[in-house]
Amino acid sequence: MTRTHLRLFAASAALILGSAVAAGAGQEALPSAWTDQTVVVDGLSKDWQGIPLTDWKKDGVSYAFRNDGETLYALLVIKDPKYRSTIEATGVTLYFDAKGAKSKDYGILFKKVRLDPEAYIAHLEKQGPVSEEDKAELRKKAGFYLYHHQVLDHKGKPVEAVSEALARPAVFKYAPDGPAAVYEFSVPLLRGSDLAAGVGAGPGAPVAVGFEWGGQTEEMKKAAAKKQREQANFANEEADRGGDPQIVRSTGTGPTPKKYSFWTSLALAKSGS
């Protein structure tokens, strides 16, 4: 190839690549709906009437967003029970990336947890003093369910919680809606630090949002590892007795629950939009 042809080829390749990048960058983001109304996070989809749902899995999983000047509200509707996987045990993680790179460097895990009375009292004391009389009444209960959130670092590990008196907490609730399960989330737009819950982008700004749930829980992983060790030991014993160790090893540990994850590019609404 001559030098002239080489330059023409390189220029054409650069033009094609530039067009592809421009097309990718120009992909239309999903618009969040602006709201001036006070939103009650209760897991009820009726509060979202008039706001269109976007399908991730047709007839399976849908989602929607709206925001005011301080808060992003997200709705996740799992219509087909097969997509729930182990969501009750794993909870739902929302990832936010204001750079649009779909990075999992920052996430918030939302999960319903059961606390014994002492753990629940400790949780309440993070928000303010609890009288001895109230503690005595709480200790009479068997336990408490808490719709809990934890900020996760780039390794997916919980960070040290910021006092709720110093930062607005994220909130979520979920409820059945016929055969579907409805998850509703509220996250402050402002993120004071990577220890606090927040989207990290303001009204009118773009942000990539990721949803993730399901898969193996830590208990499942430990149980599977234990079963594999037991099978390996039994197979070795079977081999020592002159039997066929493959009979033991072929039993397996059963199917692994699926983990579901997807991202969307979101354009936060601003007043008057």
Predicted regions and their residues:
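Bacterial N-terminal signal peptides that target proteins for export
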Residues: 1-11
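Serine/threonine-rich, low-complexity intrinsically disordered segments
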Residues: 4-6, 18, 253, 266
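Bacterial N-terminal signal peptides
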Residues: 9-20
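Structural preference for beta-rich elements and adjacent junctions enriched in aromatics
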Residues: 24-273
